[in-house]
Amino acid sequence: RQIGRYLKEWGFTPQKPVYKAYEQNSSEVTQWLLKEYPKIRISAKKNGAMILWGDETGIRSHDQRGRSFSPRGKTPVVIKTGKHFGVNMISAVNNRGKLYFMIYKGGINAETFIRFLKRLARSRKGTIFLIIDNLPVHKTNKVKTWLRNNGRIQLFYLPVYSPELNPDEYLNQDIKANIVGKIRMHSQEDLKKGVLKFLNKRKRNPQQVKKYFHHPKVRYAA
């Protein structure tokens, strides 16, 4: 208690930390922010391309996030299933409020990633610049072959270990904070329905999607 009082007097406040991998290369991040991304943005404008930011994530029934209210001195109790199950999704967002997503079974592989790329290609007639992380599946020969045969989508890669630079990461956080622990889930199907309902709600609200780009770490992409 005394330490907390001192911290308050010194101007410190309790805040949710931003996690940063020690493997991250700060020079690569600087290069991305000052050179690489501005070049992508200029090229997109020149070619009439839409820039999207993509990512994969898993939502687990036992994930614990967010807070709940209760009388002072009493810990809130949330009734949830003791079973463990999950739902995997891949999504993409842009700073105009567009949201694309797909639920998939099992781990991400080249076939699943290509299936999502096909969905993106069908969503518009023009060129798409998709910015993603350096997951090996994004660089497989199958993916490269598909991209060569379907030239309307180009992939660009974020600096390694830099999820905080990806606006789509804040969609992932939004889902996990507002699904697990806030809806009753007795099965994987319940979780899947909850995730789809939430994503469709966000898809219908472009202004909410745009807010992901307000975070200080991704404001450069707004």
Where are these regions (language model features)?
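Conserved short alpha-helical interface segments
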Residues: R1-Q24, M50, T57-I59
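RNase H-like two-metal-ion nuclease catalytic core shared by retroviral integrases
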Residues: S26, D133-N134, F156-I179, E189-L191
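RNase H-like polynucleotidyl transferase catalytic core
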Residues: V18, T75-T81, N149-P167, I183-R184
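Acidic/histidine-rich, metal-coordinating catalytic segments
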Residues: G126-K139, N166
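Short, aromatic/basic amphipathic alpha-helical patches
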Residues: T140-N150
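C-terminal anion-handling pockets and recognition modules
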Residues: Q2, N47-A49, E169-A222
